[in-house]
Structure formats: C-alpha cells, structure tokens
C-alpha cells in the first residue's frame, strides 16, 4: 500500500518549474508502473513531462477524468522542514506535491478492480507558467482518451482539514498577464522641455487605468486590474525614455475579461497619444480561463460530499486566483473544488506547509467519488 506521507515528502523535495519536471515525471512513472504491474486494463502515455494513465472500462459508456498538476514554483523555501526542497530556488508552495500524492492514492484504489467506465488520470505539467492543460489539448495529447467529464482539486490553506468547498458556477477567475512599455525621449533633468518623460506618462496611465474597474465594470460582477511592477529610469537627474509596467487582469467571466483587456489597451494607447508617445501593449491570457463548474455535475459532487462522514461541505464564493484547469473545463464538462489543508501561510508563501493528515482524507473522499462515477 502506498505510503502517502512518504510519497508527499519525496515529491516535496524535488520541485521543478513547468515543462522541466523531469525528476518529478521519473518519480511518478516509477510509482505508477509499480502500481499498474499486472493490470492489463491499464495503458500509460507521456507527453513531454506529463503523464496520462488510462484505465479501460469493462463496459464503458463514458470516460471520467481526474487531473492533477505537477509543477513547482521559483520560490526559495523557508519552511525549515527536514524534507524541504533540494532544488535551490524551487518549492512546492502551491500544494502540487499534495495534489500528486492524492492522485496516486486514488489511482491505487481505482486499480483494485477494473472499472465499468473508463478512467483517465492526468498528471499535467506547467500549470503555473505555461498553461500545460491547454498545451496538451492543442497538441492532441488526449486523443481518444479525452474525458467526457473532468474533475480536479486544489488545496486551500484557510480551510480546515476535512473541509471541501466548491460551487455550481465559477470557482476561479480568468487571468491575463499584461505588459506595457511606454517609449518617449530621454534627456537631462534640467531640460524637460527637450525630452518626453516616459515615467510621467506611465504614472498617468497607472492612475487612469483604475477607472476601468470603477467605471467600465458592472459592480455586481467585479474585476481586478493590478500592476505590480513599474520600472523606469536609472538615476535622479536623467529623464528616462522608457517605462515598463507588468500587471494582471482578473475577471470571473471570459466576456468581462475581454472587456477589461480591451479597455486597458485603449487607456494605454490614449494616454500615450495624449503625450505624443509610443506604447506597446502585450496581453497574454493563454489557457488561464475562468474555472467554470458545470452546474449539474457540481451539484452531484456537492451532494455526494455532503453525505460523507468526516467531510464538511462549503458552498463557497468565487476566488480571483487563477488556474489553467479553466481551459480544460471550457472543452469538457467538469468540476473543481477546494480541499482544506489548514496552514497559516497562503499559497505561494515560502513557509506554506499543509497538514499531512489531509492526504488520507483527500484520497478517501476523491476515490469514493471516482468509484461512484466509474460505476454509473
């Protein structure tokens, strides 16, 4: 029987960023091959650093998919754990080590007998940086294994162990990366009339763009426009010719995301034109679409967990965090939910350390749900 805690600790020590998860893939394949030995109803495929494990059903009417992400983050770990990251500047600070371990535990249970329906376990790379789900889908990695229904979870530090939270609508926002570069004319600080100050223009933009959310977005729907990077200038007495901004747009529907993206671009171009300056605007959403749960499937999942002993189900509001599972759910009906891990530190924090007792709870809950779906 799989040692869940040891498996998690092994994976926690080898975090790798998206599409570089070579050690992670090798570890997972070793475990998967041991679990599936002698199971002639199982097939395994790889796609770059990803893995697909397909359980052929005995009387299949559909394929049920379970997705887990496998990549880490470019963060220096500060947990002080004896099994902390062995990869300098890399950390499983988003709980993907937990996601993988739970998926392996569920796979082990699913292999106890051949399911009626097909089951697909997806170990997806590059959730954090390259929208690996979209890359796999667009590259045809699923082939005839593409699920009819897709499910997945994400750990959540501010929920207690034993709590599962989701809803029948949108769980995560869609996110769009924004890069803006204003190009003016540099000069001496004493002669501003001979220059065109990119720093001043970018500052105008930062204040003006706040009106997008306050005046273009329905306040009932909401959206976020945040610029976390502002780079301009090299010294105090030189007017800079360029200013660079790097930010994010977040919205709970794709229509709203597209509206905000359009308005941000328009404001940037308008401010630049007003100051007779050039501007470059790069908008990159890729596969980070809103995670929209299928209402009927979500209701079914919520009712199932609501009746499980040891599980407290929470009907939760959407979060403005992003997840590339939204892309797969735009292609396949499915559901995502939060799993409580009770950590005082948020996701992506260098000290984030979930409670390990959630591993057994997660495996028991998810595997029982997948068993039900596979038997329908």
Swiss-Prot record:
The active site is at 69, 128 (proton acceptor). It catalyses: N-acetyl-(2S,6S)-2,6-diaminopimelate + H2O = (2S,6S)-2,6-diaminopimelate + acetate. Gene3D superfamilies: 3.30.70.360, Zn peptidases (3.40.630.10). InterPro entries: AcetylDAP_deacetylase, Amidohydrolase, Bact_exopeptidase_dim_dom, Peptidase_M20, Peptidase_M20_dimer. Keywords: Amino-acid biosynthesis, Diaminopimelate biosynthesis, Hydrolase, Lysine biosynthesis. CDD domains: M20_Acy1_YkuR-like (cd05670). Its EC number is 3.5.1.47. The keyword Hydrolase applies. GO terms for biological process: diaminopimelate biosynthetic process; lysine biosynthetic process via diaminopimelate. Pfam families: M20_dimer (PF07687), Peptidase_M20 (PF01546). One of its GO terms (molecular function) is N-acetyldiaminopimelate deacetylase activity. Pathway: Amino-acid biosynthesis; L-lysine biosynthesis via DAP pathway; LL-2,6-diaminopimelate from (S)-tetrahydrodipicolinate (acetylase route): step 3/3. It comes from the Bacteria. The keyword Transmembrane does not apply. Catalyzes the conversion of N-acetyl-diaminopimelate to diaminopimelate and acetate. Belongs to the peptidase M20A family. N-acetyldiaminopimelate deacetylase subfamily. This is N-acetyldiaminopimelate deacetylase.
